[in-house]
């Protein structure tokens, strides 16, 4: 969903490809490739750890990074994020919530979208799912998010009430 959100929101990039860091989990790469094939857009896997970010030449609509990476490394992604932004690309970071208690969050590094799984916070295993996850966006991308946003309000008697704040 984050890749599709970047493609919807980054109208300036047109039909440019999405670049995936080679240090993403293999299952994440497989899911994104499957969606890309079904929807007809190009995906490229590249090592994005180089000094210039390792971004391939040509037009890019967005990049996807992971923190920590598949190999367990914790990398400062601010350089590749800045390089991607300079080229008009949006950035998604797949981030482990527990790791974010110790490292710089994706939003503070300039990422547009952060996603991840929350199963490690005590949701019991349930034969592969379902379990909770999160999708967070920078300000201004809320209307590009899929689904519905629920807001907290007060009813006529002053009690807490939940309402649909946004539906896409």
Which role does the model predict for each range below?
Residues 124-168:
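Active-site C-terminal subdomain of aminotransferase-like
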Residues 1-59:
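PLP-dependent aspartate aminotransferase-fold enzymes
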Residues 25-26, 46-53, 70-71, 97-101, ...:
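Short acidic loop-to-helix transition motifs that present clustered carboxylates
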Residues 68-87, 98-105:
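Active-site core of PLP-dependent enzymes with the aminotransferase class I/II
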Residues 45-49, 63-64, 81, 91-95, ...:
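Pyridoxal 5′-phosphate
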Residues 107-123:
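Conserved active-site segment immediately N-terminal to the catalytic lysine
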């Amino acid at each position: 969903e984050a890749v599709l959100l970047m493609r919807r929101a980054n109208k300036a990039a047109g039909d440019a490809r999405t670049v995936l860091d080679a240090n993403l989990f293999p299952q994440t790469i497989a899911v994104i490739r499957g969606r890309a094939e079904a929807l007809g857009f190009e995906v490229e896997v590249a090592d994005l750890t180089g000094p210039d970010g390792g971004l391939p030449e040509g037009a890019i609509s967005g990049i996807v990074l992971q923190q920590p990476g598949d190999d367990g490394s914790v990398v400062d992604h601010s350089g590749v994020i800045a390089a991607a932004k300079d080229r008009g690309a949006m950035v998604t970071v797949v981030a482990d919530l527990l790791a974010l208690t110790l490292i710089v969050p994706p939003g503070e590094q300039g990422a547009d979208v952060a996603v991840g799984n929350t199963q490690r916070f005590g949701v019991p295993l349930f034969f592969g799912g379902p379990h909770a996850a999160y999708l967070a966006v920078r300000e201004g991308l809320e209307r590009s998010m899929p689904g519905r946003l629920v807001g907290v309000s007060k009813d006529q008697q002053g009690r807490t009430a939940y309402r649909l704040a946004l539906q896409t």
